[in-house]
Regions:
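Short alpha-helical elements
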Residues: 2-262
């Protein structure tokens, strides 16, 4: 425990230094196009064997002028600017950069291709996370509520009723906020430096313990710490025997350090 606390303390110091450096660099990334270009460069560095020389996923048909990597980069750049409206993004924001992005596709094409490149985006994200935080032996798992509508409107919400019911939102309870909500539950596993390595969505009513059943497919020879909702004797034994994963509930002091770091 002493070794782990010391490692957490050092990591907190390192994160503060990185954060200060990032804030100083962000002054130069003052517009959407600058972020788009920078993110595109990063995507190219981590897309080896994922796309061809033109930056597209190999497939039949005409070669798009606006590459798949550019679709991913534009999507991430918009997220970094907290832009959640595609209409506003294409009708207003991107009009400023018509000359810089001559091959820009339409909003409908962007919407369709962003769905098709979701797997590419996730693969690049995992490679970046591994590069930033690849040698970790300690991880933290936690969840947070994702509310899709107000509790009173939950029974009238039609989301997910026409498809797979297991993926539809549901009523759930958040113990940390002591409140009920309607929506999903976001589970995430991060390392000591705060880098998210994996995540998943579940119905709000699904117990946290169910998320740990599939985690052995991605992790091995490590320690994972979570609150009591993720701890179960059967799951702990299974994870240790199959993947040498030590699943534990940390002391309050260690848990607070994890939360501050993330």
């Amino acid at each position: 425990v002493k070794i782990m606390l010391e490692k957490l303390r050092i990591s907190l110091i390192f994160i503060n230094l990185v954060l200060l450096k990032s804030l100083s660099l962000n002054r130069r990334m003052h517009n959407l196009y600058t972020k788009f270009v920078r993110i595109l460069e990063i995507c190219k560095q981590f897309s080896n064997n994922l796309v061809n020389d033109q930056g597209n996923i190999v497939r039949c048909g005409p070669v798009p002028k606006f590459s798949d990597l550019e679709v991913v980069a534009l999507s991430l750049a918009a997220e970094s600017e907290s832009i959640d409206s595609e209409k506003w993004l294409f009708d207003y924001k991107l009009q400023e950069y018509k000359e810089q992005i001559p091959n820009l596709i339409s909003r409908r094409q962007f919407n369709d291709r962003r769905k098709k490149t979701a797997g590419l985006c996730e693969a690049i994200r995992k490679r970046i996370a591994l590069k930033m935080d690849g040698g970790e032996d300690f991880f933290l798992v936690d969840s947070k509520p994702v509310e899709v509508c107000r509790l009173a409107r939950g029974k009238r919400c039609k989301m997910g009723q026409t498809g797979d019911f297991s993926k539809a939102p549901d009523f759930g309870y958040c113990a940390s906020q002591n409140t009920y909500y309607f929506g999903y539950k976001l589970h995430a596993v991060c390392g000591l430096s705060g880098v998210v390595h994996s995540y998943d969505l579940s119905k709000a009513s699904v117990h946290d313990l169910n998320y740990m059943k599939d985690i052995k497919l991605e992790y091995h020879n490590c320690s994972i710490y979570g609150d009591k909702g993720y701890i179960g004797a059967d799951v702990q034994l299974d994870l240790f025997e199959t993947a040498h994963i030590r699943l534990e509930c940390p002391s309050y002091q260690v848990y607070i350090l994890f939360v501050l770091m993330a």
